[in-house]
Amino acid sequence: MEPGPDGPAASGPAAIREGWFRETCSLWPGQALSLQVEQLLHHRRSRYQDILVFRSKTYGNVLVLDGVIQCTERDEFSYQEMIANLPLCSHPNPRKVLIIGGGDGGVLREVVKHPSVESVVQCEIDEDVIQVSKKFLPGMAIGYSSSKLTLHVGDGFEFMKQNQDAFDVIITDSSDPMGPAESLFKESYYQLMKTALKEDGVLCCQGECQWLHLDLIKEMRQFCQSLFPVVAYAYCTIPTYPSGQIGFMLCSKNPSTNFQEPVQPLTQQQVAQMQLKYYNSDVHRAAFVLPEFARKALNDVS
């Protein structure tokens, strides 16, 4: 069963043929990623989406939502560490953090490591993803045991409407802009996050891939610049995401913020204590250095 030209990815066991999971999607037409499957571990349709977990030959357990890979045990750390530490290390004192999405627990795991973080609220609309992750991705879901966490199973939009001027950092760990997640890439969502942030607050959102979605990234950057005095785009590498890269849109309400230089640089001792495998202060700085085609597109340089 192949998706149509404008359709979603093939989901569930239908995406597994002859021992291989194959990811295709209209958001990255003309290309596919395949992983060899050792065992199908879980398949169920929740109220919101199709949830598939399989054990792969080389990437460990893999979580797939609506036919699109969300994380694998082998490479998830790069994305989780970056989407958490880029904003946290760009804020002078991030005590209260809000996570939208991130049901697999990876972002939460990284956020609660920070000693300055006193409380974390996570809004995840699909409780089934949380339960599946606790069972099949325990190394990611470990953060759910943190005493810093308040878990809110429900709509992040409604939660932020009721909690304004409340958070130092907001992190949105969303899936790709299809279906319900499409609204998380709109100006109205960023405006809502702005009102939920404190006066010097910082946000970081999943920002798609510069090789595939440059027009969308440019559009997002433009409306972010109309809302925030400081906006920056960064990226990291991750093998099982489309084209091997994923980006991050960062915004600050504080005009003196310099995302390219961490205000709280981690020492190598802290990196070791936090068991980081991708992020360090040099990687932080390098993440904002874009290839020329992306730099030109995002900065309107002719």
From Swiss-Prot:
Activity regulation comment: The activity is thought to be regulated mainly by the availability of decarboxylated S-adenosylmethionine.
A Pfam entry, by short name: Spermine_synt_N
Modified residues (N-acetylmethionine): M1
GO biological process: cellular response to leukemia inhibitory factor; polyamine metabolic process; spermidine biosynthetic process
Residues annotated to bind S-adenosyl 3-(methylsulfanyl)propylamine: Q49, Q80, D104, E124, D155, G156, D173
Pathway given in the UniProt record: Amine and polyamine biosynthesis; spermidine biosynthesis; spermidine from putrescine: step 1/1
EC number: 2.5.1.16
Keyword Acetylation: yes
Molecular function GO terms recorded: identical protein binding; protein homodimerization activity; spermidine synthase activity
Catalytic activity of the protein: S-adenosyl 3-(methylsulfanyl)propylamine + putrescine = S-methyl-5'-thioadenosine + spermidine + H(+)
Active-site residues from the entry: D173 (proton acceptor)
Enzyme class, broadest EC rank: transferase
UniProt keyword annotations, A-Z: Acetylation, Polyamine biosynthesis, Spermidine biosynthesis, Transferase
Residues reported to bind putrescine: Y79, D173, S174, S175, D176, Y241
Domain PABS, chain residue ranges per copy: 18-253
Family under the similarity heading: Belongs to the spermidine/spermine synthase family.
Subunit structure: Homodimer or homotetramer.
Function description: Catalyzes the production of spermidine from putrescine and decarboxylated S-adenosylmethionine (dcSAM). Has a strong preference for putrescine as substrate, and has very low activity towards 1,3-diaminopropane. Has extremely low activity towards spermidine.
Protein name: Spermidine synthase
Gene of this entry: SRM
